[in-house]
């Protein structure tokens, strides 16, 4: 009788350990795929607009910046979608209060930066969240 009780206890303990291990594995990100994508993809366009707007909102510069060149865009699929974007941006002639498409600054006010953005995206709900931003001077 006692041996049977021990076997049952060990069996239940083994099931508990397996369930804990399984639930931990489910919580971890599982990479489905990472691929380089084209800037013309609709969710990429929206994401580029979002990162530009977010950069300009949080920047202490008096002028808006705009994307001059896209260097790389990767889409990472896990339990959600992330874009990893590397771009060159330049300071424009528009102050932050202006929302027009403006020329880039020339001369003394010229400033060019290279930025890496990691963005959480749910395109069909138009949800964007900046996960990481790193910008450095490039001129």
From Swiss-Prot:
Disulfide bonds: 94-102, 115-135
GO cellular component: cytoplasm; extracellular region; nucleus; sperm flagellum; sperm head
Molecular-function GO term, any one: cysteine-type endopeptidase inhibitor activity
InterPro entries xref list: CST11, Cystatin_dom, Cystatin_sf
GO biological process, one term: killing of cells of another organism
Signal peptide: 1-28
Gene3D superfamilies: 3.10.450.10
Full protein name: Cystatin-11
Gene coding for it: Cst11
């Amino acid at each position: 009788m006692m041996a049977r009780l021990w076997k049952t206890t060990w069996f239940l303990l083994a099931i508990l350990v397996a369930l804990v291990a399984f639930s931990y594995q489910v919580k971890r990100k599982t990479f489905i795929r990472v691929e380089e994508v084209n800037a013309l993809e609709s969710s990429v366009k929206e994401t580029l607009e979002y990162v530009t707007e977010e950069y300009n909102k949080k920047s202490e510069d008096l002028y808006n910046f705009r994307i001059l060149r896209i260097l790389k865009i990767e889409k990472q699929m896990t339990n959600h979608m992330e874009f990893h974007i590397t771009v060159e941006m330049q300071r424009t002639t528009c102050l932050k209060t202006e929302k027009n498409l403006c020329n880039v600054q020339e001369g003394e006010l010229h400033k060019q930066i290279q930025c890496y953005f990691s963005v959480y995206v749910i395109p069909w709900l138009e949800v964007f969240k900046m996960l990481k931003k790193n910008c450095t001077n490039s001129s």
